[in-house]
């Protein structure tokens, strides 16, 4: 997979939601040793869903521009807006 980085990577916060620079595609990297729950919300503040991010893993997440991400705890999940192609 080829990715194009569209912004600076930053830590996903447990205290606030982020659209990840209004991203449609997000690279999510978890560098810690414990699993975390990532919650996806809509622009109105309602939860769309959540998933468990395994420790020492990475994934590519597709979302709507106004959807937000938040981690349950910790400072070891990083996100960045990207474009990609297979």
Where are these regions (language model features)?
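Surface-exposed, low-hydrophobicity beta-strand/loop segments enriched in small/polar/acidic residues
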Residues: 1-86
């Amino acid at each position: 997979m080829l990715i194009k980085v569209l912004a600076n990577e930053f830590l996903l916060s447990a205290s606030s939601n982020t659209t990840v620079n209004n991203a449609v595609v997000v690279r999510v990297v978890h560098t810690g040793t414990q699993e975390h729950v990532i919650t996806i919300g809509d622009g109105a503040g309602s939860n769309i869903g959540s998933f468990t991010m395994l420790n020492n893993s990475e994934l590519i997440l597709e979302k709507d521009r106004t959807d937000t991400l938040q981690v349950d705890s910790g400072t070891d999940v990083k996100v960045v807006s990207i474009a990609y192609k297979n």
